[in-house]
């Protein structure tokens, strides 16, 4: 089932950013050139913005595809992790954008939240960093039930 329309309804505003400015926890809309050469737009939650393993040639973006992520599961994840303001975006661009607080390492987050969760695991994707053409960070309405833990990256 496609969950993207539900998520798009919660986006308050967007702003273009450089892909090198991506950080964990951001919700972004990105234009991505797939391996078949076709370009497509994806809305994702960034888990690891630029990762390269010891045998990898290219950097990878690890993310959750919002189109495959039910909004109830997304808000459960938000409740578990918390929300913070993005200090770097405020400092550089004066953008007041909140993101998920992903304090732990990407491996620990994957093992504790995604590995055994069928719904979250099915939304997990990797994207080649070099194939990302454009990025727009989204200010997502997390609602009033989530506590804001302050502004820090």
Language-model features, listed with the residues they occupy:
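Intrinsically disordered, low-complexity, charged/polar segments
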Residues: 65-153
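Short, solvent-exposed secondary-structure boundary/capping segments
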Residues: 52-66
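Mixed-charge, Lys/Arg-rich low-complexity intrinsically disordered regions
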Residues: 1-23
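Short coil-to-beta transition motif at edge beta-strands of beta-rich domains
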Residues: 18-37
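Short beta-strand-centered aromatic/proline hotspots
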Residues: 37-53
């Amino acid at each position: 089932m496609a969950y993207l329309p539900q998520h798009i309804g919660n986006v308050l505003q967007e702003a273009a950013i450089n892909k090198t400015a991506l950080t964990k926890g951001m919700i972004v809309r990105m234009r991505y050139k797939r391996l078949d050469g076709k370009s497509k737009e994806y809305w994702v939650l960034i888990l690891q913005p630029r990762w390269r393993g010891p045998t990898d040639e290219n950097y990878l973006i690890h993310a959750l595809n919002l189109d495959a992520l039910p909004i109830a599961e997304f808000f459960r994840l938000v409740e578990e992790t918390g929300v913070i303001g993005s200090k770097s975006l405020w400092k550089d661009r004066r953008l007041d954008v909140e993101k998920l607080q992903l304090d732990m390492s990407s491996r620990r987050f994957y093992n504790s939240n995604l590995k055994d969760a069928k719904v979250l695991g099915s939304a997990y994707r990797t994207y080649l960093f070099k194939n990302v053409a454009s990025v727009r960070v989204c200010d997502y309405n997390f609602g009033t039930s989530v506590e804001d833990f302050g502004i820090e990256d």
